[in-house]
């Protein structure tokens, strides 16, 4: 969903000179091609990746740890999120033809799953912190933690629904040269933006910085040949989050405090490009939080064999050998309780 207000409003740009209006028209042509293409790329990649994670987690991997509970809800949220993108892609090329009810529904679904995804990423970070730093306690309370994890996931979905109500209530179809589905309410827009920035960026970012800093310190004092691999994964997770989410959130923050940027066509380009980059998280989450696990990759090849897409080619033995070798790694006696560190 394009996060802008005036791009399609020709009346907004009629007050500017001919050169500015020409730049605006060029931008509109660019956005009609760029955003729908990016939406479809994210949709296809996110659909395939998150569907694989869900199928393997439910039918092959089972729920063996608290992280596994989160890794079922994360691809579910991302999967529903990417399923809204074809609608926004079509509306970007043409106009909104799906009516007001679908407008409110898709705005709600889009926002709910955005918040859910970010909050679950935060919970995964905290869970990894507990398992690595407080390994013995986590191991002894594994059953209790599983129960609490399911409750936490339910609460996350409820909280996401509640904070998405403004988009659902105030979302509507507007006629700005063409029909557009968007959320727009000046009175509460500041509160909505603050909620988006807090739950969707600052909370997961600060949690990652604090928790992963302590985890890195713990791993540096741990033995095992897989220590460096785990550190690389942590740095990769942080780098992907910063590179995909920071630019768009920074642009939104600037836009909310400096309205004069609306008159700059170059700033409009910045918004849609950073927005597209931010949406890549829905494609990358399956790789960062599932496919890094040897057990998950082994189950993936089992799925490939079961559906008959490719010959097995002795893959099972390959992963079995790698998995046995990985078990020599230990930052504590039960680091393997999490999906991330079953590398």
Swiss-Prot record:
Disulfide bonds join 103-181. It comes from the Eukaryota. Pfam families: 7tm_1. The gene is CXCR6. Residues 1-33, 91-104, 166-188, 261-276 are extracellular. The keyword Transmembrane helix applies. Residues 61-69, 127-144, 217-232, 295-343 are cytoplasmic. This is C-X-C chemokine receptor type 6. It comes from Cercocebus atys (Sooty mangabey).
């Amino acid at each position: 969903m394009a996060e802008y207000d005036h791009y399609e409003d020709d009346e907004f740009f009629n007050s500017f000179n001919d050169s500015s209006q020409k730049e605006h028209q060029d931008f509109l042509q660019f956005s009609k091609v760029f955003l729908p293409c990016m939406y479809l790329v994210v949709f296809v990649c996110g659909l395939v990746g998150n569907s694989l994670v869900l199928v393997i987690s439910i039918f092959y991997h089972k729920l063996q740890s608290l992280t596994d509970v989160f890794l079922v809800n994360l691809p579910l949220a991302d999967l529903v999120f990417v399923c809204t993108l074809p609608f926004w892609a079509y509306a970007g090329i043409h106009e909104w033809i799906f009516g007001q009810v679908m407008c409110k529904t898709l705005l709600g679904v889009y926002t709910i799953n955005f918040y859910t995804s970010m909050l679950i990423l935060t919970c995964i970070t905290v869970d990894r912190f507990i398992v690595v730093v407080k390994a013995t306690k986590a191991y002894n309370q594994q059953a209790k933690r599983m129960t609490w994890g399911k409750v936490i996931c339910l609460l996350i979905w409820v909280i996401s629904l509640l904070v998405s109500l403004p988009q659902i209530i105030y979302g509507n179809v507007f006629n700005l040269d063409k029909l557009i589905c968007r959320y727009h309410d000046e009175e509460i827009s500041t509160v909505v933006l603050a909620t988006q920035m807090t739950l969707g960026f600052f909370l997961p970012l600060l949690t990652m910085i604090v928790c992963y800093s302590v985890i890195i310190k713990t791993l540096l004092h741990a033995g095992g040949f897989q220590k460096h691999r785990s550190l690389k994964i942590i740095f990769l997770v942080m780098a992907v989050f910063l590179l995909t989410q920071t630019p768009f959130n920074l642009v939104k923050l600037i836009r909310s405090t400096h309205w004069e940027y609306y008159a700059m066509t170059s700033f409009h380009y910045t918004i849609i490009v950073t927005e597209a980059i931010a949406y890549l998280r829905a494609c990358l989450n399956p790789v960062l939080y599932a496919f890094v696990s040897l057990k998950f990759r082994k189950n993936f090849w089992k799925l490939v064999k079961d559906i008959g897409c490719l010959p097995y080619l002795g893959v099972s033995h390959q992963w079995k050998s790698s998995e046995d070798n990985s078990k020599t790694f230990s930052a504590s006696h039960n680091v393997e309780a999490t999906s991330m560190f079953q590398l």
